[in-house]
Amino acid sequence: SDGSIWFTDPPYGIIHGKRIGGYPGKMQYGGCYVFKYDPMTNSIEAIVTDMDRPNGIALSKDETHLMISNSGDVKYLRRYEIDKNLKLSNPIEFARQNPKNVFDGFRFDFEDNLWTSCGESVVCYNTSGKQIDVIEMPERVILSTLMICTNRCS
C-alpha cells in the first residue's frame, strides 16, 4: 500500500538446455534474487539472495508477511515477516512439494489461506502451512500462473 513493488527474477527464458521459451542469454548478475523497488528513493534492492530459483511471490492481506516460492531443485514456499520499515525477518519453510511439482502463481484469500498452482492441481494451505484443500485437474495440464477470481479473494 506504500507503493513498494516486490518481485522475483528467475532465469526462465534465458537459461540454456531447458525447454522454456525466451531468448538464451547470460544472467546480468550473480544469482536469482527477490527485489524490492522503493518509490521514495527510486531504488531497487536485492532483499532475498539465498534461494536458487525464487519464482512466485505474494503479500498477505495485512501486508505483514511475504510468501515466496522456490522452483529450483527443492520446491518450497518460504514465508517472511515484514516489519514496519519493510525489512524481512524470520523466514520459515511454509510448505514443500515433491520434485515434479512447482509452486508458481498464488494468492491469499480473505481468511489468509494461500491458494497456489502446484503441478497438475491447485492446493490451498491455511496460515499454519497445513494443506486444507486440493483441486485436481480433470486432465493433464501444467498450471503455471494462477489467477484466483472468486468471492473469497479481494
Predicted regions and their residues:
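Beta-rich, blade/repeat-based domains predominating
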Residues: 1-5, 28-33, 46-65, 97-119, ...
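A short loop-to-beta-strand structural motif that recurs across blades of beta-propeller domains
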Residues: 32-35, 76-78, 121-123
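A short beta-strand motif characteristic of beta-propeller blades
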Residues: 42-49, 90-96, 130-135
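Short loop/turn segments immediately following beta-strands, especially the blade-tip
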Residues: 79-87
